């Protein structure tokens, strides 16, 4: 019915609920996408690593690497994935920030260096990926 299909903007203001975090995340994602021209650029998306069992997706667009961990409980302390280059990267966004209702489990101060990995036989980055998060790395 119409009664249940309408938007309820007042939910964001109820601090007992978590909608304020969702609203903050939504505003930041729009800001992030606009500042990095993610949707305007016609560059293709390059799949770097997909693991259905561990529920991980890593892809690259422009100079950004997106790491999605969709697993509801498993965090990966030594997630290693190929980068197809030998650059260094730094985290510029992660969905685990406390302003989004997260736990601040990802350090923003670490520089990740792409080094040769024998498992993949190419340059890789090793990173901590908490459960139910997205991390975006930018090439330095």
Feature-to-residue mapping (PLM):
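Carbohydrate-interacting/catalytic domains
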Residues: 1-140
């Amino acid at each position: 019915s119409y009664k249940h299909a309408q938007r309820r903007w007042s939910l964001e203001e109820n601090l007992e609920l978590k909608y304020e975090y969702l609203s903050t995340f939504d505003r930041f994602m729009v800001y992030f996408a606009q500042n990095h021209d993610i949707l305007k650029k016609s560059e293709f998306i390059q799949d770097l690593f997909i693991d259905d069992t561990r529920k991980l997706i890593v892809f690259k667009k422009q100079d950004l690497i997106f790491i999605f961990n969709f697993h509801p409980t498993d965090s990966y302390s030594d997630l290693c994935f190929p980068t197809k280059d030998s650059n260094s990267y730094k985290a510029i966004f992660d969905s685990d920030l406390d302003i989004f209702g997260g736990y601040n489990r990802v350090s923003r101060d670490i520089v990740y260096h792409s080094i040769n990995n024998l498992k993949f036989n190419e340059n890789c980055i090793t990173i901590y990926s908490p459960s139910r998060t997205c991390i975006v790395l930018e090439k330095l």
